[in-house]
């Protein structure tokens, strides 16, 4: 039998592998730093990404980019997530898979709620990969690790035998909830403490109700107080939406009322005016005591994450991962101007500012702009009259750490202070000693004759 197809007919083809290949290619580009147009800094760890991917996966980033109109050279710093949590969130955006420790499930859900990522916000009702010891030939996975896969396309309709539900659809705990002693808390990152901080933020933002969550023995009670209701109808001072945000107001994060959602975004976008706490060692300021304690580990010997190749210690596992790249010796990112090579693309980007006049960090109090964020922070301290770096010998204060170090070397070090008068005095002493030696030699010559 012959088939005749008219030229006017339309034939449709579906590429079932396209979606998977598309994500795989995007993730490879991110890992290599190719075409990345945004850098997100979390706990001093820089993550390169594609702005369109962040905006597509997160309503928070979508609103953020529309609000700020950031360009390709922008660096955004967020301070309401842990770096290891954000790393997993970023991996999920590019792979549709996420691995999360059981003690961090609630924290991951809270992060998903704030970032506006529905899948992470509903982790307890998602499907997870569960492998029993028998299925793995006696080798089970980590006791406190779950690998959660998000179905792609038609794969959502199929279920493998090793996939089971986590919790019920109404977010209430299921009968087969994992029981047992909670995992030990490491590195001071207590899940309870972290959730308490998150609850305080939600209260302050005026959320009328926070869903009751119970995953793996951790519970966050619903919270409804008169104070929070009052806050829900108020807008924080100087933190208001402009007319340009009206078209995106309807894209609320699940679980937030309209007023609370607006306040939440403004809070996360601009921060909250709190009293700053300064580090006694270096003067760096923080908005809460928890972040200060974490920073103070940099000045102590508490560095539990040790490199096996050089025994150098680090305070977080993310910092250790960054350090391990040094030992590979592979530096794929080279400067086109001077040929200097770098391990990471962000380091090359930072170096390239030396050859250009790019100054992305602008002062909001004057017209000056700087190539590095640290220089901007030093400059802003001068505007505010802050001098957090205090000399331990004479209590003289300075705005920059380098000024304090220079002062200590010049005034309080064991070396003699070098001044023009000191140089002249030392020269005169040398000349006098030379003349005395010459006179003594002449006397010895006369005596011998």
From Swiss-Prot:
It comes from the Eukaryota. One of its GO terms (molecular function) is DNA-binding transcription repressor activity, RNA polymerase II-specific. Residues 153-194 are annotated as: Disordered. Pfam families: BTB (PF00651), zf-C2H2 (PF00096). Keywords: Activator, DNA-binding, Isopeptide bond, Metal-binding, Nucleus, Repeat, Repressor, Transcription, Transcription regulation, Ubl conjugation, Zinc, Zinc-finger. One of its GO terms (biological process) is coronary vasculature development. A zinc finger (C2H2-type) spans 277-304, 305-332, 333-360, 361-388, 389-417. InterPro entries: BTB/POZ_dom, SKP1/BTB/POZ_sf, Znf_C2H2_sf, Znf_C2H2_type, ZnFinger_BTB_dom_contain. There is a cross-link at residues 46, 203, 249 (Glycyl lysine isopeptide (Lys-Gly) (interchain with G-Cter in SUMO2)). A motif (Nuclear localization signal) lies at residues 50-66. Belongs to the krueppel C2H2-type zinc-finger protein family. PANTHER family: AGAP004733-PA (PTHR46105), ZINC FINGER AND BTB DOMAIN-CONTAINING PROTEIN 44 ISOFORM X1 (PTHR46105:SF5). This is Zinc finger and BTB domain-containing protein 14. It comes from Homo sapiens.
